[in-house]
């Protein structure tokens, strides 16, 4: 091999190493936070959740590929009026949010990502919308629409399915996370942080009353009627592109007892 060829090979190897999202032998750690707003037994609520991903080796975490969020038992999904309309995935892909009715929106969020060749501070995807999708096998389906701009330009649609739970968990939102390219045909970005809500907070729906369009706020899922000792448990399983996985847990504290009048 000529000196020029060796130099090119070494340069290519260095570039590949610089673009790797995590160092060899390192693993991902996740911190999970959840909330009920309001946190009152039996009340309509907005469920908030967020997570932060880091790499034990100090580099970027491996791209996230799957998330299973396990929700506390006793949450009432029957009385909610979230998702009175259905958003069709094909319309969402083709037309974006304009392709779906306002009454299909069920939550909001944002994400912080980093490109493999970035400086580590992260770039925000400020708009992630959660919408009610067509049910699958009788299960609730949540569509997520992420609208990324510079430097990560991407409009991505992916979905989660609410599966029945067991034990202390009443359901599991199973979501496959698509890889987000950093540039066209480039390596995927790493997700550093996600914040999201499912519930009526900041949502406005519309209905027709006597021929007039009237705005109203939908009813969210309900906080369980009783709180187990230690609080409402949440757990999440995270899967990554490098084949590793990890589990994060947290609790929402039990609400204070109601004051007797």
Language model segments and positions:
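Bacterial N-terminal signal peptides that target proteins for export
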Residues: 1-11
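A generic signature of intrinsically disordered, low-complexity regions enriched in glycine/proline
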Residues: 4-6, 23, 131
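Bacterial N-terminal signal peptides
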Residues: 11-21
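Ser/Thr/Pro/Gly-rich, low-complexity intrinsically disordered stalk/linker tracts of secreted
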Residues: 25-261
């Amino acid at each position: 091999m000529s000196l020029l060829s060796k130099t090119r090979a070494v340069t290519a190897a260095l570039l590949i190493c610089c673009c790797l999202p995590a160092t060899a032998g390192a693993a991902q750690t996740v911190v999970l936070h959840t909330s009920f707003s309001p946190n009152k037994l039996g009340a309509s609520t907005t469920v908030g959740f967020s997570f932060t991903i880091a790499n034990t080796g100090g580099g970027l975490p491996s791209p996230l590929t799957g998330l299973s969020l396990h929700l506390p038992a006793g949450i009432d999904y029957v009385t909610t009026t979230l998702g009175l309309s259905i958003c069709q995935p094909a319309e969402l892909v083709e037309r974006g949010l304009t392709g779906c009715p306002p009454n299909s929106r069920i939550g909001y969020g944002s994400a912080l990502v980093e490109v493999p060749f970035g400086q580590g501070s992260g770039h925000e995807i400020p708009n992630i919308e959660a919408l009610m999708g067509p049910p699958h096998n009788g299960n609730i389906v949540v569509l997520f629409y992420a609208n990324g701009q510079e430097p990560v330009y991407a409009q991505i649609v992916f979905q989660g399915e609410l599966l029945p739970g067991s034990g202390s968990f009443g359901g599991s939102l199973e979501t496959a996370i698509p890889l987000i390219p950093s540039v066209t045909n480039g390596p995927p970005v790493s997700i550093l942080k996600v914040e999201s809500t499912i519930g009526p907070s900041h949502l406005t729906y519309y209905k027709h009353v006597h021929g007039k369009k009237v705005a109203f706020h939908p009813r969210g899922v309900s906080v369980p009627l009783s709180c187990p000792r230690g609080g409402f448990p949440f757990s999440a399983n995270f899967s990554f592109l490098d084949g590793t996985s990890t589990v994060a847990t947290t609790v929402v504290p039990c609400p204070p007892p109601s004051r007797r009048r």
